């Protein structure tokens, strides 16, 4: 009969378990503290048979389990790397790798044996924690199987990905201590490069705005993406009924973000693909490269060029900001070239394991690296992508958020969008004419010079993306920027934002106002508002925004500052539903004459014990 060959070797499996069981013990010990012991602690506080206690017990057990899932990210990140370092450690020594590869075991068998031993150990630890947690919960007559199953599944998916990533790092190097370095770099390199490029563009581009991190950058940062996918899912309020005199109490049920399963499944699929790549590399890996920085010769130029370029860009930028803070583009370029060459030399010395690396070919390659590094910096400086002058077409914009000092609004009507785009173009034209950038100057630096304002725009585009810009511009009287900015700050919704009454619309308008108060800061006098008075004040604020006594001039500080003598704490209390209310703070700018007249007619009284957070509301009627 033909002899059948197994895909793994039982002896290797047993050997790995015997050698690396302390790692599994540590993994389980940490998890025991994180989950089962926390379940016991939370459940003991609910030990009883009173009405409502069982519901609280269920909520607390559920919350402990769901809140432990972010810990799975950290545990999988650490122990995925440790497990990979353990099972592939023999590849880092010429003696052990020669002994292992001399055994009558194929590399495919060895690969699957090591992978199964590592993933099997992590899975065994997870299942043990699952059972211990269930046992601890059962002692209090309730087990949240759904939450426990969710924890087990997500933890397994994370462990698969991080172990695969650690195995890839172990397969490309012959140094054991280089594995965690590569592992950490692969988890954050995309984010670090984005931060470097973002900082450079902020230096060079007029109007650059620190917007949200692009989606593809977050996906290339596994630990951050997975953390965001399983943490901060919010909480659902739950009302629990107890016997009198306790009555109804409010609790929170922690929820898992909707993206948790999809994100972890995607990364687990990537982990399987990485393991397939590791299998291929393992079969091709030369045994004699044990102890070398890179296990494959074709990876060495990639490594030194990556270290040279990334180190030059990042460390050069850091050097410029720390040692030459006032330096310009030339200073930045020199810093990046110097640091790039140093990193390039250091990488080659590590790869060659010697200091004598200089020859004609090496100098030519160094010169090529310097040219590429300089080209990258120059291309960013020249804005070859057209970022600085990119202006969206009006038909491509679904809505726009505009902000100038304290005046802001969000609109989707074509007229508002077109006005903001016109201002956008005018600001760029003024910059092209003057070349003036004021972002890094304080107001004291420009004292006696042109009047400046911060202007921010945020376009939401039809393709689902956004375009954000932020400028500090000088406003010359009669210029296009002055004219267009005047039109925008004099919109009704812009005036409403200056007063603060714009937020009232989301709560139902004036009819939602139930009370309020006005307090003078200088005398600590207070005027409490009845429901009718508070609604009258809200109506007058809306009237001031819609029909101002005169146009606002963005060149004047009066357009956003308090009216003289009306620097007050004004709060309107609005009802959201039958059980919830909130407050809307108001300002009294100079143009709000109706509000000023109304406040002058109020009766103020001194009350040293007055606390705005405990104002009694006598006229709350939930009709």
Question: Which residues make up each language-model segment?
Answer:
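Short, structured surface segments that line ligand/substrate-binding pockets
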Residues: 434-474, 550-586
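Helix-loop-helix units of permease transmembrane domains in multi-pass membrane transporters
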Residues: 87-120, 286, 290-291, 530-550
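Long, hydrophobic alpha-helical segments
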Residues: 67-96
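Internal/C-terminal transmembrane anchor helices
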Residues: 303-311, 345-387
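Terminal transmembrane helical anchor/hairpin motif
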Residues: 3-5, 41-66, 191-281, 286-295, ...
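Secretory targeting signals
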Residues: 39, 62, 69, 116-179, ...
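Membrane-interface segments at or immediately adjacent to transmembrane helices
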Residues: 378-463
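Aromatic- and glycine-rich beta-strand/loop motifs that create alpha-glucan
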Residues: 1-27
